[in-house]
């Protein structure tokens, strides 16, 4: 059985044709950005505001490694993997789509601003 045909512990990834882990692998995304991606695309279907905060936390760690320590060398297959393709086939709303695009373009400030705005909009 193909591992994409089943999910353990919920159905929060079963809503689209292109699975988050496939997109992360296909785009050669760094682990920290992959975590930002998965929490940003599933937050409405699984962990809510806590998932958005987790995404922001992983992004802050990535910024530390990338900006402060200069450890992260981010190369993404931009011509092969298009975030619009993933968003279209998985009905990803605009704010989440903007986060994905910003991560893939190494625009960490935009990703952080968009995540912060999304968190603020959804706080009680």
Regions found by a protein language model. Give the residues of each.
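Intrinsically disordered, low-complexity regulatory regions
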Residues: 1-124
